[in-house]
């Protein structure tokens, strides 16, 4: 989850005119929005490590290690000591995109362990390719190009094939007798990430749940009526796309009302994205009911598609007028008839008058009233600057991310249920003796696994919750999935354990501490820009793919091109398909990548446009050829675990660029003819 734009202006201005500095390093240069880099030649030895930005000193919060993401905190009296084991050129990379800075330290090796064999981009004259396959397929073997379905017989170690006209010059080569998809492997997963609300409306009857309604303007931050039934209706489409895991936005009950959207408060912002959870025991009514969820999960499993829930344990949602009125917490500066006169019969119907913005509703709220706000979550549950609650801290674990209430997941004090739940008659939450906030959250989340057979979680804001909490969630969810599979042997896809991937801003292809605390994969934030550099020449992915294939023999990542928190990747048109789907490790398609879903209305929050409605009219229209291209490559990927899990050997070809991926008995050869 990226910080809500309406609060970005209140956070430290890391990306403004001031620059980062560190003793012994030249001034940092900005490498894309929010990331800063500096290089220096340093001798072996021990030295203090501090960084400075706009007269603020920062230092690593933990032990200093190479190639690991280090959280930064304000400097203490004693700077940490950095031990350099050899002379070399060291790189400091600071990432501020999550609101708190992180640091990555690396050293340039004298000789990179993997060197690309590609010196210049190959050219193609459009004629058939003669490919030496002698090291991959035996003499006399029938080899099929999966894309065009052409078959050639290996003769003198070679085959000749013409890439299909729509393939962008690709040959996807496999043994011709390969006729079914291989057993599923998370290292080769193709995950489709969808904001359910923006995908497909399968049940119009739930469109205005909790009194939510349209704003009559651009509908930037409103619910757009997508739901679980809509997802079920599109499962055949996803199956044809080669998808074998569906990551859906958190379906749990969200705050009912809105907050001001964007830096200018120019639209109402509802929790359509699922990141402002209010009750982890209920489905949000806009998403549907429990029968809808069961149908979705069962129908997906019948098609070989796993279901992942997006989950949040770091924070709750903001206080909204709708929830204050419904659950009787908080306080207003208004009294008596002033309330109805200013806010109306139903407070959530308030709209800004002349000279006001959607932020102006805050002017009516008395955030200092201790008694009123004690009726909200309660001090045992959250820290916030509201009322008499404990103030947020300044570190990753206790900060109030975008001023969202921070859940005390580190607390060892029994908390009871959230205070306002006593006025929430529809909650399924039951008090459990001795339970802390963390205990409740892991119990509630794992119960969805136990009841429905959810296959995994994508964890939001992982770095803002202590690692033992994630291990506890993984342990409980794993036990829950085992129980569900034992009770539902006819519905279980296989015996694979519960899978968990996480978001930690700036994380790349490295085996960090997250992997030792329950995570099976982490989102690879580096891949988007690496792929952007190879849009015009696929061969330029060679070094990246070789390094990933080598490193990922021991762990896994989830790579993406587009996301709701960064941007839509639309460079190169349908060439994005091969850039993503041929990557080692698990990959994530963001809904509409395959159909070039357009950037939507965005107001003063530049991220809102990445969450536009799925462009179904284009899937069978102007984007049909692009969708077909994605389908071909994704289906090929699903047939061959070697693509995601295999080791890579780059080939020296007379024509084009090619590589072999091999995993166990599975072996494929991919050729790109070159630029035309």
Residue spans for each PLM region:
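Short, polar loop/linker segments at the starts of domains and inter-domain junctions
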Residues: 29-31, 151-163, 203-228, 574-577
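Acidic glycine-/aspartate-rich tracts in secreted/extracellular proteins
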Residues: 54-59, 198-199, 640-641, 675
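Substrate-binding/active-site clefts of carbohydrate-active enzymes
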Residues: 183-189, 199-447, 451-452, 473, ...
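Loop/turn elements at helix/coil->beta-strand transitions in domains of secreted/extracellular proteins
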Residues: 187-192, 239-246, 301-308, 452-457, ...
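Conserved, mostly hydrophobic/aromatic
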Residues: 143, 194, 238, 248, ...
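Active-site-proximal helices and loops of the catalytic beta/alpha 8
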Residues: 116-169, 176, 315, 331, ...
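Bacterial N-terminal signal peptides
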Residues: 4-13
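Insoluble glucan recognition modules
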Residues: 16-152, 165-175, 190-196
